[in-house]
Amino acid sequence: VRRRSVLLAVPAGLLTLAGCGDDKSGSDKASPSKEPTSPTPSPAPTGKIVSGPVPPITSGEDFGDKPKIAKGAGKPSSDLAVKTVIKGNGPTTAKKDFLQVNYLGQIWSSAKVLDTSYDKKKPATFQLGAGQVIPGWDQALVERKVGSRLELAVPPAYAYGKQGQPQAGIKGTDTLVFVIDLVDRFNGKSSAKGDKVAQSNIDLPKVSANTDGKAPTITVPKKAAPKKLVSEYVIEGDGPKVKKTDALLVQYKGVLWKNGKQFDATYKRGELAQFSLQQVVKGWSQGLTGKKVGSRVLVVVPPDLGYKDEAKPGIPANSTLVFCVDILAVL
């Protein structure tokens, strides 16, 4: 729900991937709504993917463990090298999916670590094929199983090109090495994951708890709309609690309290929504803050926390809005 139409899509701008830097750079504090401070990677050639060479992982070999990677030996391949270290058994990734990954990246020739998510205790989330990460990632991470650990050797043509990334100490001749754990993937068929919560208040809308990727049903009671914000679990996930400064990846559906008519939904578009809680109407920012990732939440937004006396497409002025929101990930 955004102030000028219905949903504000926030560019991901993942500094840790589109522009690597060490932990002291503050990249882990970057807002997804901010512009990257690094140059956009050059388009990569579409070439073959080879199986090596890649340097050995010397410790932290299990999925989820922070790895230590040896210095590269000899000359790296000019092609994109990808080795499956651990093959997962989860769903298969596809272009336009949102991926959630843990990773560590370093320079082939020096083993200098550029960036890692393991120390931040928070996976990175980005969309495949949307230019949010270096081209080597966009190509290597398609058609992989969630639960897999991959090791990549990414030559300059698939990373930052001949210009390199001087701010991070990456020369135009540097091959980059990454270990990547594929934690999860999300797309237009994703749903909340968690425990169903009883909906016993007869004065509130009822939301279905289906998790098949189809739009939930929302049944609005023929009663007076609440004057205050309502935020209740339909499905309670087990992820971290959302902070008011977070940006989220969600599925949602919105209907009018007055007649139950749908005015917007991600499900009909077949794509997820991403937004910062600082850039949406107050009913969303207040209603989702403190809720757990993985949850489905019923949010009833009174006019003073929504669009007030301003009409929007499909939304009359002074409308009470009813949403169900699946919180899939924090960006």
Residue ranges and their predicted role:
Residues 1-331:
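Cross-family detector of peptidyl-prolyl cis-trans isomerase
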